[in-house]
């Protein structure tokens, strides 16, 4: 059984897409093992995206991720990282397949509604960043 982290970004929360995103996960048989809404501080956003610290979009990304509440979830299931990434679609919504979350709801490459872990190692770090073991119901 694999786990991954999913975030509904501030634009997705603002557009009232929480239910739609959760429904898409559930329609694919993905178990939601943990879920919470929170408001990231600048320090939390910088820590979470530290891997991008030297990238030109880092400041813009952390400002955006602190611009409103987010929903963080632990998703669980067989091959859930790949399933989640397929449901999300390409980072650039213009390149995402029809019917994916980003193609259906994103407005630009940064405001692309959702974030998802890209590998088991990343998922382990990201899940631990937001959740402790007591908060995850597997």
From Swiss-Prot:
Coiled coil: none annotated. InterPro entries: NDK-like_dom (IPR034907), NDK-like_dom_sf (IPR036850), Nucleoside_diP_kinase (IPR001564), Nucleoside_diP_kinase_AS (IPR023005). ATP binds at residues 9, 57, 85, 91, 102, 112. GO terms for biological process: CTP biosynthetic process; GTP biosynthetic process; UTP biosynthetic process. Keywords: ATP-binding, Cytoplasm, Kinase, Magnesium, Metal-binding, Nucleotide metabolism, Nucleotide-binding, Phosphoprotein, Transferase. SMART domains: NDK. One of its GO terms (molecular function) is ATP binding. It catalyses: a 2'-deoxyribonucleoside 5'-diphosphate + ATP = a 2'-deoxyribonucleoside 5'-triphosphate + ADP; a ribonucleoside 5'-diphosphate + ATP = a ribonucleoside 5'-triphosphate + ADP. Its cofactor is Mg(2+). It is found in: Cytoplasm. The keyword Magnesium applies. SUPFAM superfamilies: Nucleoside diphosphate kinase, NDK. The active site is at 115 (pros-phosphohistidine intermediate). GO terms for cellular component: cytoplasm. Pfam families: NDK. Its EC number is 2.7.4.6. NCBIfam families: PRK00668.1 (NF001908). Major role in the synthesis of nucleoside triphosphates other than ATP. The ATP gamma phosphate is transferred to the NDP beta phosphate via a ping-pong mechanism, using a phosphorylated active-site intermediate. Homotetramer. Belongs to the NDK family. This is Nucleoside diphosphate kinase. It comes from Desulforapulum autotrophicum (strain ATCC 43914 / DSM 3382 / VKM B-1955 / HRM2) (Desulfobacterium autotrophicum).
